[in-house]
Amino acid sequence: MTTILKHLPVGQRIGIAFSGGLDTSAALLWMRQKGAVPYAYTANLGQPDEEDYDAIPRRAMEYGAENARLIDCRKQLVAEGIAAIQCGAFHNTTGGLTYFNTTPLGRAVTGTMLVAAMKEDGVNIWGDGSTYKGNDIERFYRYGLLTNAELQIYKPWLDTDFIDELGGRHEMSEFMTACGFDYKMSVEKAYSTDSNMLGATHEAKDLEYLNSSVKIVNPIMGVKFWDESVKIPAEEVTVRFEQGHPVALNGKTFSDDVEMMLEANRIGGRHGLGMSDQIENRIIEAKSRGIYEAPGMALLHIAYERLLTGIHNEDTIEQYHAHGRQLGRLLYQGRWFDSQALMLRDSLQRWVASQITGEVTLELRRGNDYSILNTISNNLTYKPERLTMEKGDSVFSPDDRIGQLTMRNLDITDTREKLFGYAKTGLLSSSAASGVPQVENLENKAK
């Protein structure tokens, strides 16, 4: 059976991930007119720029959907977001600022929950708005087929018949109007935005050019912290974790994690926390650029890692970072539920996150400017009395340190001999100033 259909399967049920925007509206109406039987599925991901979710399925029915369903994905999305924080599943960083993989997390949830809903309705063909140059086409492909082994893929934007008739937004708008729907195109922004409760992605158009900065973006989850006319008073916030799970903000507990994440977004968003500008590698190895918002994820991540560094030893922290980056890449590639990812997730959640209990108090200022004011945990292995510079009882003595220095550094003689051996072969140059052979200065090599 062919997995990817290049042309519209006339007379068959097709499930379309329906956002209510111009693209999916025109696609749904076109498919119905051409003889397919479209079913519309809309994911409620807590998108901060969506005002009326219930209206979206109603519009789908007006455009010819056989049936339209709104699938509440918020609880599962937040659960996956917290899991990503527990595992440090983030691999794109620039200058210490992190992209929290909020779009990949959203695709993992959407790609499984919508296809599961389609399967309930006997719909085994799926279409969405992803293009062939992006990451989402592969993410949705993988998650869809993981959920339904019988699934076939039909994407209008890979169908030459659809492209020839409705290849651009102007053509789609005219098509909708000609069919009796007063669909006016929204004002074109200088970039494209995709969002869910965990974060927002701004990319494409003017943002494809690196001389266009964050200053052209209107944040939808935060504030323009770079604009000095925007008043942003400093604010203290306390985050509490229990066994790796965020349970309270400023002493307030929440009935569910969705409400907790919304409050974290509000707190971080007041300062523009978690906004970053990243150049990344897409799945196809071409580089792209995005500007991201994730105020709640950033707030929880900062507090989590503060507790992490105070609780776990150096080797555990090193494995957390290494495995977290590896897991972040798998998440980015649409492999969040693959066995290699589950293995890493289980290890990090079981042996790292389970010990993260305590409170961190932060002072948030503008953007990603913050200070850590206090860290409290019964699990801290940070013991200031072990290293105090004051006179008093000590857990080890000067004689203990002499023994440690002797035993820990028995290889100094071997290292010295190797360095002079490298110098004899020309790999290193002798240094009269330091007495130790060193790599020759690049400027000297150029001469």
Curated annotation (Swiss-Prot):
Which pathway does UniProt place it in? Amino-acid biosynthesis; L-arginine biosynthesis; L-arginine from L-ornithine and carbamoyl phosphate: step 2/3
Question: What is the enzyme's main class?
Answer: ligase
Q: What's a Pfam family this protein contains?
A: Arginosuc_synth
Record-listed L-citrulline binding positions: 99, 135, 139, 192, 201, 203, 280
Mind listing the UniProt keywords for this protein, alphabetically? Amino-acid biosynthesis, Arginine biosynthesis, ATP-binding, Cytoplasm, Ligase, Nucleotide-binding
Tell me the compartments it is located in: Cytoplasm
One GO CC annotation: cytoplasm
Classification via Gene3D superfamilies: 1.10.287.400, Argininosuccinate synthetase, chain A, domain 2, HUPs
For this protein, what is the EC number? 6.3.4.5
Name of the molecule in the record = Argininosuccinate synthase
Question: From what organism does this protein derive?
Answer: Escherichia fergusonii (strain ATCC 35469 / DSM 13698 / CCUG 18766 / IAM 14443 / JCM 21226 / LMG 7866 / NBRC 102419 / NCTC 12128 / CDC 0568-73)
Q: Which gene encodes it?
A: argG
